[in-house]
Structures are given as C-alpha cells and as structure tokens.
Amino acid sequence: MGTVVEKAFRGEFETHLTVRPDARTVSGARLERWAGHHGLKLTRIVLDRGAMPDQPMLTEQGRGTLAEQRAAARLRSAELRAAGFSVVRVKIEAAPWNEDIPRTADEAAELSPVCHFEHHIKLLLSGEPEVASARAVAQRHSAHLSRNARRAARHARHERFVTQRCRAVGRPEARARLDALLGALAAAGLEVTEVEEEFVVHDDHPAVDAGWIDERTEQPVGERGQRRPEVTV
C-alpha cells in the first residue's frame, strides 16, 4: 500500500454530526431546539436496517479546506457535549467539484481509505411494494434505503432515500455507477425527485452504519449504460 496523501479539498463542504438517540434527545425535542438556536439543520435519519438505524444528525455548511472543517467540527462537537448530547460520529463531505476530487482509480488510491463517492437519491413512493422494489434495486448497486423520520407523508406517498457508495474509483466511474442505479430505478417504475453527489473526505466512526449497505465493487451486468432519467436537482 502506498503513502496516503492528505489533500485540502478546497471548496464547499457539509459536516454531519450524528448524536446518540435517547428519550430526551428525540422525544423531548431538546436537540431540535439546540439546532434551531445554533442555526443547524436537524435530520432524523432512519436506516432500513443496521446496527444503529436511528441516527439524529445535525448538518452545517462550510467553505474552505478540510482542515478548517475538521477544526470547526471539533468545536461544534464540544458545544454539543457541553449541552449534554453524545456525538457518536463526525462525517465531512466535499462537493464533487472541489479541488483534489479524484478523477481516476490511481488518484483515489492515494487518499485515505475512508474517502469515497456517495450518492443520495430521493424517491417518492406509494405502498410497500414500491419500497420493496426500491430495496431490491438498491442492493444490486452497493446501495440501500433510509428515510427522514421528521418528514411527513404526502397524499398517501412517502419519501425514501437511496444511498450509494463507490470506493477506489475516480469521478467518471462513480458517475457511471450512479447512472446505472438511476436507470435501474427508472426501469422499475420508481419516481426519482432529487439526486445529490458528494465525496466523503472524513468519517471518524463509519461503524455507525454497520450492517446497512452491502458494498460491491462491480455494478450488475445488464444494467450498465442505462439511460439516466430526468430529475429535479
């Protein structure tokens, strides 16, 4: 294994702070009040399966370098702990157009093994059969489902999110895998409403997601090159 190169990834970032859920955090709305007071976005992610399916998460936008985002995350984590919350994970994602985003597998191999492309696809589904269909498609593409527990259903339809991870590849290959997943979702008749591409540059506790996504290195034969559906981003 070669030497890991520390990059700045200068540009736009999102920092996600996952808080351990408990009765006071979730039911008592303490975290919601704290987030509102500090100008952070609160999302309560519920994974479809895994070791820690309930994941209250605070999100903060930032610009600059990875080192600056890490420093800001340390300060924010200290504030949360001082307020009585247990921060179990800090995850920092760079925009795919930032500096130093890998274009090839060789460039990706120079980075920390925690670095990878991550794609988030929002679906609007109706009924358990569509959820089961989305789950089956996702599992064939190094992806799986989650939902936002704070988002109410709309007109008997509800949102699900598909998260796909692509490791040890450059952005063109990651985009090809995303396109294959989108094509498979469209072929299954599932409605895609949003697509987001990110590049994970820091994750201090990836085991929080243990048992959720069964990651593969190859996309399914027969689904390569499928046409990407039109979406609203």
Where are these regions (language model features)?
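Long, contiguous binding/interaction regions
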Residues: G2-V233
